[in-house]
Amino acid sequence: MNKIVFLGILIFSNVVFGQDEKVINELMNQWHHAAATADEVTFFGTMPEDGIYIGTDTTELWKRDELKEWSKKYFDRESAWAFTPISRNIYFSKGQNVAWFDELLDTWMGKCRGSGVLEKQKGKWKLKHYHLAIAVPNDLVEDYLELLKKSEK
């Protein structure tokens, strides 16, 4: 009897996990699509009020409403920015109420990495923290460092 109960719990857990992974993938794809189509409501609605966005520049660290203010000129256009996900890995806490991910993106800046943390709030996943980073190939790091030195002068 205990084996049957355990097996049932195991199967149920895998189904729930698979559903959450699918929901998060869809949510993040919609979030990127919202930026590409300048859909402010969907883009910022995905983040809670205390959500954080870290961009590629060292000055780009915003709470959701600060990002909304900064990016208004971009969302006033037909497309704010267009990042296309290439791949994504999603991980879950034991309680299944926190998830984190990393993703590889195709962007106007070349390949970028995004990473983030989502929290399930009132049954819905919200993007609490997102970090965008430009991926610099290792063999170009010295050239990259030279560019940084020039920009600091």
Feature map (PLM): residue ranges:
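Positively charged n-region of N-terminal signal peptides that target proteins for export
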Residues: M1-I4, Q19
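Hydrophobic pocket/interface hotspot
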Residues: W31, F43-F44, G51, L67, ...
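Surface-exposed, charged secondary-structure patches
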Residues: V23-N25, K68-G110
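Short beta-strand edge/turn micro-motifs at domain boundaries
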Residues: K111-V141
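Generic recognition of short, well-ordered alpha-helical segments
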Residues: D65-E66, R113
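Short, low-complexity N-terminal intrinsically disordered segments enriched in polar/charged residues
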Residues: G8, S13-G45, D65, D139-K153
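A short gly/proline-enriched turn/hairpin at secondary-structure junctions
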Residues: G51-W62, K73-A80
